[in-house]
């Protein structure tokens, strides 16, 4: 948030998440970097807020991960500028295969500015990844995601040297949530068999 008091309040609230993560035995928490649509303000605010929270989390051996989750966080060059500027070993990314909307229309709630190359975006974010989210929306008759080439995505993940967890998120409406998660899991397993 561009207002430092509001931002500091958010950091304080998120410290409870860090403490909970310690008790639960987690390695990371995922955060958003919302608050402003003005690029320079966002960069400054994101660096400040993430830096403060990551400093606290480092004392607890917890990672702070930013997901591409709308706004400037869905512009991987800008997000990685923040991550690289902070240069903190416990401040990284959680690349999501499907969250690339940079700007929404307030009235229609539709995306009006989207980062176009999902694959390049994932590749840019992977060097700082400490978790990955396999997003899916809909599947064709062969079980492939209709918008995202999972073999291509997983090859990028593999080529980055990543060997951690890949979470699953199904956001489609054609099948139920449980069925969507299972279909995404099956797609991941099948895609993994086709990697170089």
Predicted regions and their residues:
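Acidic/histidine-rich catalytic cores of soluble enzymes
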Residues: 47-155
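Non-catalytic positions within long, well-ordered alpha-helices that form the structural scaffold/packing
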Residues: 22, 84, 158-159
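Flexible, glycine- and charge-enriched loops at secondary-structure boundaries
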Residues: 3, 7, 11, 39-43, ...
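C-terminal helical cap(s) of enzyme catalytic domains, especially alpha/beta-barrels
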Residues: 177-196
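A structural motif
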Residues: 21, 26, 129, 162-163
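Structural motif corresponding to the early beta-alpha repeats
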Residues: 1-48, 58-63, 99, 104-106, ...
């Amino acid at each position: 948030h561009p207002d430092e008091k509001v931002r500091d309040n958010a950091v304080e609230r998120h410290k409870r998440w860090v403490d909970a993560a310690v008790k639960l035995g987690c390695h990371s928490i995922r955060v958003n970097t919302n608050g402003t649509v003005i690029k320079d303000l966002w960069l400054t605010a994101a660096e400040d807020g993430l830096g403060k929270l990551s400093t606290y989390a480092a004392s607890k051996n917890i990672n702070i991960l930013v997901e591409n989750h709308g706004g400037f966080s869905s512009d991987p060059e800008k997000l990685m500028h923040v991550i690289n500027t902070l240069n903190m070993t416990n401040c990284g990314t959680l690349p999501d295969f499907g969250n690339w909307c940079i700007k929404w229309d307030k009235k229609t709630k539709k995306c009006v500015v989207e980062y176009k190359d999902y694959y390049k975006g994932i590749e840019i974010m992977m060097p700082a990844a400490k978790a990955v989210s396999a997003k899916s929306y809909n599947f064709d008759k062969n079980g492939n995601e209709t918008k995202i080439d999972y073999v291509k995505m997983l090859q990028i993940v593999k080529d980055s040297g990543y060997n951690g967890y890949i979470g699953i998120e199904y956001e489609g409406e054609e099948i139920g949530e449980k069925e969507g998660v299972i279909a995404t899991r099956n797609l991941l397993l099948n895609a993994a068999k086709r990697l170089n």
